[in-house]
């Protein structure tokens, strides 16, 4: 049985399989295909020629544009058809030709996306990725499996991020970057392979960081990247002023949880 709210607007040329759950005021355009295990929240708009498959849960007020593919079988050769998931939050904009693949058992079983993100044309989000809130991935950005983007990350166009890499909050990656190691919060980076070149001060201003916080973040950045010290030598000094500055504590904690190493 299809569970379709009476207020949903579904084109007669769309295919909604038995079992799909469609919320209030959802719109589904012509030639879109919604699989039997899909749940779509209220006021989400699905334009024409979109395919949503697998055990996929989509929240409210999302916009999904033409030729996007969500919840399809992932490209991990170990995948054996297990009922893994894609879970997407609210108010995301998923533009044309975006692909978001379902998770794997080995990676926790879920590809997870938060709220208020923008994925521009041709973005690829592979299995088991975890994306926070208010991130932007520009045209042709590619995330390999198990990549994590914390909140407020911007990924420049034509960039690629290696599997298992973690990108910290408020990071700005320049266009065409190839990222193979973790990028700490607040950092701007670019290149092949990506290298740090400063603190994302403009982004921090836009998000309401005050001058003392930004000054402390810059000092922490300089200790890591410009003092000539190793990370192990710099961390005790950063700990001294992280006590009174939560923004620096976030920076410090990132180094302690990194498993792939930090870009230098």
From Swiss-Prot:
Keywords: Acyltransferase, Cytoplasm, Lipid A biosynthesis, Lipid biosynthesis, Lipid metabolism, Repeat, Transferase. The keyword Transferase applies. It is found in: Cytoplasm. GO terms for cellular component: cytoplasm; membrane. It holds the Pfam family Hexapep. InterPro entries: Acetyltransf_C, Acetyltransf_C_sf, Hexapep, Hexapep_transf_CS, Lipid_A_LpxA, Trimer_LpxA-like_sf. GO terms for biological process: lipid A biosynthetic process. PANTHER family: ACYL-[ACYL-CARRIER-PROTEIN]--UDP-N-ACETYLGLUCOSAMINE O-ACYLTRANSFERASE, ACYL-[ACYL-CARRIER-PROTEIN]--UDP-N-ACETYLGLUCOSAMINE O-ACYLTRANSFERASE, MITOCHONDRIAL-RELATED. Belongs to the transferase hexapeptide repeat family. LpxA subfamily. Homotrimer. This is Acyl-[acyl-carrier-protein]--UDP-N-acetylglucosamine O-acyltransferase. The gene is lpxA.
């Amino acid at each position: 049985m299809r569970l379709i709210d009476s207020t949903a607007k579904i084109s007669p040329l769309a295919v909604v399989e038995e079992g799909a759950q469609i919320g209030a005021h959802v719109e589904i355009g012509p030639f879109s295909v919604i699989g039997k295990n899909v749940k779509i929240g209220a006021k989400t708009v699905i334009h024409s020629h979109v395919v949503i498959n697998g055990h996929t849960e989509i929240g409210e007020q999302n916009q999904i544009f033409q030729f996007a593919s969500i919840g399809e079988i992932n490209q991990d050769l170990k995948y054996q058809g297990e009922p893994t998931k894609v879970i997407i939050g609210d108010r995301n904009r998923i533009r044309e030709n975006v692909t978001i693949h379902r998770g794997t058992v080995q990676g926790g079983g879920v590809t997870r996306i938060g709220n208020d993100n923008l994925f521009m044309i041709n973005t690829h989000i592979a299995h088991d990725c975890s994306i926070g809130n208010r991130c932007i991935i520009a045209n042709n950005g590619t995330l390999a499996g198990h990549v994590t983007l914390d909140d407020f990350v911007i990924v420049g166009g034509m960039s690629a991020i290696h599997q298992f890499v973690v990108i910290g909050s408020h990071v700005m990656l320049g266009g065409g970057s190839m990222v193979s190691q973790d990028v700490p919060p607040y950092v701007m980076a670019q290149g092949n392979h990506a290298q740090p070149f400063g603190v994302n001060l403009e982004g921090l201003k836009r998000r309401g960081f005050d001058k003392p916080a930004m000054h402390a973040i810059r000092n922490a950045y300089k200790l890591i990247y410009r003092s000539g010290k190793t990370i192990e030598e710099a961390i005790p000094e950063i700990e001294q002023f992280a006590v009174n500055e939560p923004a620096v504590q976030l920076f410090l904690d990132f180094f302690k949880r990194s498993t792939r190493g930090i870009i230098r």
